[in-house]
């Protein structure tokens, strides 16, 4: 099915088969579709509503065209979410990654510039002095030696360049907002993935199952975050042993009080980094930044197999933060990545 026929189909609210979606996505990502066709298709698909089969097929094409990071490790985990929740929180998933690595996890963190917050993971890491221009082999070394490597999305998904213009001009959510976290270049089989709306919690777990993931938690909180929240219960779809279980969790289940997120919002990358450091520092009886990171890092520690239960994962995260090793891990990654910088970049 060419893109003209695909546009006509989705406008009539007809679902595409996986094979049809793969053909259309391949045309989009190899420059065979015009910007107008790309925009028309994405909007038509959004209005119809993307299906699990369509999202899975699109992710398969993106994965096939990406620059891979080959890690010979088990239980590699990612903490990349969709963004787009409007919460303007500091970068919780990035802070969580340092905690998971400090707990013994192997984190292949995939991310880019800002979407929902005023600064994305790449913005915060740059602010922390971490070099992002790594090739696949250098990312592997980071994961193997530090326990955490960051894959800057544009470095690994060059085929996305054809969709960048239409996406910016439309300035509305499309299937691509979902695809980023589904296309980890290291093919991480374990994942905590936040989504921007509750309606995507179960379907995205089904997509990840179809893509071969092993243990994942897809989350969205009642207060609208693409994170596990400290201010409200959070919806979860957990994929484990080939089965998907849906449930709700509350911070109080883990001994963390319900509390406002107003004080952990960030206006820019500098403020976000300050809150990341506050979270990893872990000091103070009242520290909402620490608490939200402990919850989300605990989930990643659980899905990566370090902990047998989510509660145990949160306890491990709290111990790691309290011990100060996560804060040191950030400095270690900054020093390690700077070794890969060319003289012109210094």
Swiss-Prot record:
InterPro entries the UniProt entry points to: Anthranilate_Pribosyl_Tfrase, Glycosyl_Trfase_fam3, Glycosyl_Trfase_fam3_N_dom, Glycosyl_Trfase_fam3_N_dom_sf, Nuc_phospho_transferase
Listed GO biological process terms: L-tryptophan biosynthetic process
Coiled-coil positions: none
Cofactor(s) for this UniProt protein: Mg(2+)
Pathway recorded for this protein: Amino-acid biosynthesis; L-tryptophan biosynthesis; L-tryptophan from chorismate: step 2/5
GO MF annotation, one: anthranilate phosphoribosyltransferase activity
Binding annotation for 5-phospho-alpha-D-ribose 1-diphosphate: 81, 84-85, 91-94, 109-117, 121
Subunit annotation: Homodimer.
Purpose of the protein: Catalyzes the transfer of the phosphoribosyl group of 5-phosphorylribose-1-pyrophosphate (PRPP) to anthranilate to yield N-(5'-phosphoribosyl)-anthranilate (PRA).
UniProt protein name: Anthranilate phosphoribosyltransferase
Organism: Marinomonas sp. (strain MWYL1)
Lineage: Bacteria, Pseudomonadati, Pseudomonadota, Gammaproteobacteria, Oceanospirillales
């Amino acid at each position: 099915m060419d893109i003209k026929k695909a546009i006509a189909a989705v406008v009539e609210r007809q679902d595409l088969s996986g094979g049809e979606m793969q053909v259309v996505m391949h045309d989009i990502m190899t420059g065979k579709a015009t910007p107008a066709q790309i925009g028309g298709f994405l909007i038509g698909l959004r209005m119809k509503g993307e299906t699990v089969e369509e999202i899975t097929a699109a992710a398969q094409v993106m994965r096939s065209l990406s620059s891979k990071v080959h890690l010979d490790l088990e239980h590699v985990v990612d903490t990349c979410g969709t963004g787009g929740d409007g919460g303007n929180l500091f970068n919780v998933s990035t802070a969580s990654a340092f905690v998971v690595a400090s707990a013994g996890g192997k984190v292949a963190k995939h991310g880019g510039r800002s979407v929902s917050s005023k600064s994305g993971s790449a913005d915060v890491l740059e602010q922390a002095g971490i070099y992002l221009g790594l090739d696949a082999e250098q990312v592997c070394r980071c994961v193997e030696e530090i326990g955490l490597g960051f894959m800057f999305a544009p470095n690994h998904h060059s085929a996305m360049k054809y969709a960048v213009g239409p996406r910016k001009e439309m300035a509305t959510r499309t299937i691509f907002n979902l695809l980023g976290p589904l296309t980890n270049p290291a093919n991480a089989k374990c994942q905590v993935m936040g989504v921007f709306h509750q309606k995507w919690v179960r379907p995205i777990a089904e997509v990840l199952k179809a893509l071969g993931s092993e243990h994942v938690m897809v989350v969205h909180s009642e207060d609208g975050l693409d994170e596990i929240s400290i201010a409200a219960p959070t919806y979860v779809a957990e994929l484990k042993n080939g089965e998907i279980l849906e449930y709700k969790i509350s911070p109080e289940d883990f001994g963390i009080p319900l509390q406002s997120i107003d004080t952990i919002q960030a206006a820019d990358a500098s403020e976000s980094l300050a809150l990341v450091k506050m979270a990893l520092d872990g000091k103070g009886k009242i520290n909402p930044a620490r608490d939200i990171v402990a919850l989300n890092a605990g989930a990643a520690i659980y899905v990566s197999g370090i902990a047998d239960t989510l509660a145990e994962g949160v306890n491990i995260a709290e111990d790691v933060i309290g011990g100060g090793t996560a804060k040191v891990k950030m400095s270690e990654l900054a020093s390690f990545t700077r070794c890969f910088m060319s003289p012109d970049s210094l």
